[in-house]
Amino acid sequence: MINIEDISKSSNESEEKQLKSTSTSSKPKYPFAAKSLFKGSNNIIPYYLSTSNTFQCVASESIQTWLLSDDGHIFTSSGNFVLDVSSGGYFVELVQLNSNSKTQIWTIDTTNNKIQNQGNGKYLDIDNLNICVAPLNGNATQKWTTFRRAPIPTGNWGYFQSKKLDSNNNYWGLSVLNNSTSYNTSVVMNKVQAKSIGQIWQMTNDGHILSRLDGNLVLDIGPSINGSKTNYYLNTNVYKANDLMQQWGINENNQIFNQYYPNLCIGFVGELGVDSTVNCVLAQPTSASDINFQWIANPTYSLNQIVSEVPEPFPAYTSGDLLASYQYLSNDATNGYTDDIRSLYTSINVSLEHFYVNVSNATCPSSIHSTEDFSNVQNQIKNELTYAINVRLVFDNYSDFYSKLFSQGSTNLTNLANLINVI
């Protein structure tokens, strides 16, 4: 059986004790952790689903990290073992993968905070800090919150190129040494090469710089240079969500600074194109214009700054005349189709312009007592519809341009390609 972990305890236990066998393969989807809503006797310390076989164990991310596969298997972080229900049908254990076993398949319900076994229909539960499965009982021991252990990519991959060129006017950029996927690999400067996957990165919404080599491999601070407290090498490491040493920002001087050491920025030591190895470092720039510490994100995306902003939620209408106004306007605008008009903003099969007219012409019914609340909701929905209409128009215009370009045959396409120097 396996246990949950009190993150205040300490000791070392391997995930690979008392494990069974049989095998095939299943590709992991993403790393995650599961925290129990059960508080325990102290009512303070949170508990996590852990691979440890003892209650007193180290609070390390590796034994709290699991890999969810597309088909519902929950792997250990090493990828060698999966969660299964024991032969007795009660306790949960770690075994090797058997794709034909339904008791190794789980469904994570993030809405209701449940983890259900598909073999017997029972739910992940806690029995004296041991992990088991049991029929649904409504207890906190069956409630789990899950969260990602890996960054969520934004989709915009590119190079971090130095603004300084070598003597032959070649660009150089951040590179994982030998394209290694191993943790604690040095990050160095290499000449930028097309499709060199070890040079391709992206900055995630939480400030990590993610390598294209692996979905869980990020830029991190490496060892100190000669014991210095202001000069460090850079390397790669496993993603840690709240580790400021792994989080970065870009300032107005095109410097990449570290969130833990905000006065230190990424630069390099050596002569580009001359020295056999040019190490990337985290150090103090000599000035705001120190070109060894200035970077170009290539390619750049005009929407990067917009889509990386924290989304501003719509005003929530949950009760009273605000909710009544929202539901009335939704029904009126959609001719009774829905009382939640926001659910249709992304639909391409409805006329948002028609909805806008209906909302604009609506008058406050007698069932709604606050005309002020009604007016506020009405103006808010009109603004939201205006935004949605304009965003859709941008993509419609692009689609129209794209279609007309190809409808003219190859001539326009060839001329355009020549114009932007791709042929």
Swiss-Prot record:
GO molecular-function terms, A-Z: carbohydrate binding
Q: Which residues lie within the region annotated Disordered?
A: 1-27
Keywords, in A-Z order: Cytoplasm, Lectin, Membrane, Repeat
Q: Name one GO biological process term.
A: response to cation stress
Q: Name one GO cellular component term.
A: nucleus
Coiled-coil ranges per UniProt? none
Q: Which cell locations does it reside in? A: Cytoplasm; Membrane
User: Where does the secretion signal sit in this chain?
Assistant: none
Sequence ranges assigned to domain Ricin B-type lectin in this UniProt record? 27-147, 118-251
- Enumerate composition-biased segments (Basic and acidic residues): 1-19
The record's similarity note reads: Belongs to the cup family.
What does the UniProt record say this protein does? May play an important role in stabilizing and/or regulating the cell membrane during Ca(2+) stress or certain stages of development.
The name on file for this protein is Calcium up-regulated protein A
Q: Which organism was this protein described from? A: Dictyostelium discoideum
Tell me the lineage of the source organism: Eukaryota, Amoebozoa, Evosea, Eumycetozoa, Dictyostelia
